[in-house]
């Protein structure tokens, strides 16, 4: 039996993690975010009602679940307050269910200004960030000048630290990026206005998780973005600024790494990507348009149209290695309904003619990579909302089996629609 279960994306994000976390938290006592910030967009549909969460863990909708934002998350007070208000307006007592690590770095207005100034300066070479200040906040953390939630306990010292760091960043904004300076007093006033709310939710997260482990409580760790966006192992430099792989759980929450029991990789039945960067199986034809339309592939955070393509099992195998995956949850299988044939990328052809079955490590090595496909019959029957494996068309079952063969990982959960009820749990991670 697994008490500590990790749910993370195996592609470039947008795999459907939020729904699965919400579904599995029916048995969990805690749900923990351990990396990223409000650049995530987790969409839940419960009884037909849609909820989009960016910063707060997906377990917040469950009354018997405590949601935790761990130290690996960069926290925007403004974004958190906005999200809390939206949920509280719907009658959800967020402050009774949410806890924070005092080590969470804060995202403040100057981080957002820097993020957007840099993207503008890059021009055609822009990375395609969400413009929410995530990267600059992580930079401040690593440079040891960042302000953290715990700094809000001493407001006088916080004001002094803020003044110093803002002088540094405003110098960059004005003199290098030729942008406007960010107003110190406004940032201070805005942050002080919510300081007591934030500090009232602070706990020792590492200690709490260790006590939960000793009691045998079920804990769900909710990843954001996807494996191929990992700062170290992703398609650098077109990546996010945090460790999206399973290794980020220990560093971003304080749970000892030996205590992770099961890692569930969320795998979309096809591939998508937002923003710039390598995408070998990207489709520019009517099939790509079909996947975008049928899958409603528009970012929950940015509203940007996602790039679409066939499932890339070469890239997914890299995710298997990096995360030591225990099982997959296959999502959006129903989007492939109606296609006469479906394709799986099984290898890459490099510019020099070599065929490889692993992803390139250097950014430049992705250039000119061509996907090698295996083509399988599609299916005309609808899989939408099917709740039993026996109800799936044989061609869909063959597709599922082939994914398992190519990756070496079992598909333990199949999602056939956005609602939590439209799911087949073949093996529950908490029972594995």
UniProtKB/Swiss-Prot annotation:
GO cellular component: cytoplasm
Compartments where found: Cytoplasm
Free-text cofactor note: Binds 1 Mg(2+) ion per subunit.
UniProt cross-references to InterPro entries, sorted A to Z: Adenylosuccin_syn_GTP-bd (IPR018220), Adenylosuccin_syn_Lys_AS (IPR033128), Adenylosuccinate_synth_dom1 (IPR042109), Adenylosuccinate_synth_dom2 (IPR042110), Adenylosuccinate_synth_dom3 (IPR042111), Adenylosuccinate_synthetase (IPR001114), P-loop_NTPase (IPR027417)
Subunit comment: Homodimer.
Pathway(s) annotated for this protein in UniProt: Purine metabolism; AMP biosynthesis via de novo pathway; AMP from IMP: step 1/2
One Pfam family matching this protein: Adenylsucc_synt
Keyword Phosphoprotein: no
UniProt cross-references to SMART domains, sorted A to Z: Adenylsucc_synt
Binding site for substrate: 300-306
NCBIfam families in UniProt: PRK01117.1, purA
SUPFAM superfamilies: P-loop containing nucleoside triphosphate hydrolases
Protein name per Swiss-Prot or TrEMBL: Adenylosuccinate synthetase
Organism: Salmonella newport (strain SL254)
Gene name for this UniProt entry: purA
GO biological process: 'de novo' AMP biosynthetic process; IMP metabolic process
Protein task: Plays an important role in the de novo pathway of purine nucleotide biosynthesis. Catalyzes the first committed step in the biosynthesis of AMP from IMP.
């Amino acid at each position: 039996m697994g008490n500590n279960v990790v749910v993370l994306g195996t592609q470039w994000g947008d795999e459907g993690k939020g729904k699965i976390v919400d579904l599995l938290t029916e048995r969990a006592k805690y749900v923990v975010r351990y990396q990223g910030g409000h650049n995530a967009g987790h969409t839940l549909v419960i009884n037909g009602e849609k909820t989009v969460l960016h910063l707060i863990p997906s377990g917040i909708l469950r009354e018997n679940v405590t949601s935790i934002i761990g130290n690996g998350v960069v926290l925007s007070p403004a974004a958190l307050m906005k999200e809390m208000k939206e949920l509280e307006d719907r009658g959800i007592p967020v402050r009774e269910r949410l806890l924070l690590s005092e080590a969470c770095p804060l995202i403040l207005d100057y981080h957002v200004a820097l993020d957007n100034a840099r993207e503008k300066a890059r021009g055609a070479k822009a990375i395609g960030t969400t413009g929410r200040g995530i990267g600059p906040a992580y930079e401040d953390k690593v440079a040891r000048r960042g302000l953290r939630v715990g700094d809000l306990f001493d407001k006088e010292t916080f004001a002094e630290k803020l003044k110093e760091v803002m002088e540094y960043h405003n110098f960059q904004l004005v003199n290098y990026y030729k942008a406007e300076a960010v107003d110190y007093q406004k940032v201070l006033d805005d942050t002080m206005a919510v300081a007591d709310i934030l500090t009232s939710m602070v706990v020792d997260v590492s200690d709490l998780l260790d006590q939960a482990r000793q009691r045998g409580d079920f804990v769900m760790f909710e990843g954001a973005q996807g494996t191929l966006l990992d700062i170290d192992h992703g398609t650098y430099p077109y990546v996010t600024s945090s460790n999206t792989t399973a290794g980020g759980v220990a560093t971003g929450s304080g749970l000892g790494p030996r205590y992770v029991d099961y890692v569930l990789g969320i795998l979309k039945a096809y591939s998508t990507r937002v923003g710039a960067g390598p995408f070998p199986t990207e489709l520019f034809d009517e099939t790509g348009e079909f996947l975008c339309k049928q899958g409603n592939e528009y970012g929950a955070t940015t509203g940007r149209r996602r790039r679409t393509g066939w499932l890339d099992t070469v890239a997914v195998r890299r995710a298997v290695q990096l995360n030591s995956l225990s099982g997959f949850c296959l999502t959006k299988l129903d989007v492939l309904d109606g296609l006469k044939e479906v394709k799986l990328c099984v290898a890459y052809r490099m510019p020099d003619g070599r065929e490889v079955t692993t992803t390139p490590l250097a950014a430049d090595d992705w250039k000119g990579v061509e996907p090698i496909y295996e083509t399988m019959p599609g299916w005309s029957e609808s899989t939408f909302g099917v709740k039993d494996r026996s109800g799936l068309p044989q061609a869909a079952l063959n597709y599922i089996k082939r994914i398992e063969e190519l990756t070496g990982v079992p598909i333990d959960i199949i999602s056939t629609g956005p609602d939590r009820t439209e799911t087949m749990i073949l093996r529950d991670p908490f029972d594995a």
